[in-house]
Amino acid sequence: MTKGPVRLDVAVSYALPRAGLPSAVSFRKWVAAALKGRIREADLAVRVVDEKEGCSLNHHYRGKDYATNVLSFPAELPEGLPKGIKMPLLGDLVICAPVVAREAAEQGKSLAAHYAHLTVHGTLHLLGWDHEDDKEAEAMEQLEREILADLGIDDPYAGEH
């Protein structure tokens, strides 16, 4: 765990009208909560998209023919950088607004809480966390619960296991 302040630059863009969507300030708060104590500085982008763009990206990068709630694209350091140079670029998150809204309604969660959860979840993926097996999934879900609790948000997995 790192201590001290986090230097954070979160660029938020919207590919659809912003009415009813979280503000850039909210996304920054959720990303900062996920990074707290883990890294000291980071640059990342959050893009909120419609279903068409979400489906296109999910198809192109994952071979899936549907839009998913969040996609994480970790940054890769360019080849040839001198040793010792560290780039704070963490990566990009793509969040599909219609999928998030549908899931929140189906799961009986507030829209803001679901956006917060998916932003934290995606940010943890950028840090290298995954849920490919049960042990990884349990560890990642527990960390998400702790981060969201610090934000005053209920356990997003309550009732699932």
Swiss-Prot record:
Gene Ontology annotations for the cellular component aspect, listed alphabetically: cytoplasm
SUPFAM superfamilies: Metalloproteases ('zincins'), catalytic domain
Subcellular location: Cytoplasm
InterPro entries: MetalPrtase_cat_dom_sf_prd, YbeY, YbeY_CS
Gene3D superfamilies: Metalloproteases ('zincins'), catalytic domain
Pfam families in the record: YbeY
Main location as per UniProt: cytoplasm
GO molecular function: metalloendopeptidase activity; RNA endonuclease activity; zinc ion binding
One BP annotation, GO: rRNA processing
Keywords tagged on the record: Cytoplasm, Endonuclease, Hydrolase, Metal-binding, Nuclease, Ribosome biogenesis, rRNA processing, Zinc
Reported cofactor(s): Zn(2+)
CC cofactor note: Binds 1 zinc ion.
EC numbers on record: 3.1.-.-
UniProt-annotated binding residues for Zn(2+): H121, H125, H131
Family the UniProt entry places it in: Belongs to the endoribonuclease YbeY family.
PANTHER family in the cross-refs: ENDORIBONUCLEASE YBEY, CHLOROPLASTIC
UniProt xrefs under NCBIfam families: rRNA maturation RNase YbeY
Functional note: Single strand-specific metallo-endoribonuclease involved in late-stage 70S ribosome quality control and in maturation of the 3' terminus of the 16S rRNA.
Name of the protein in its database record: Endoribonuclease YbeY
Species: Xanthomonas axonopodis pv. citri (strain 306)
Gene designation: ybeY
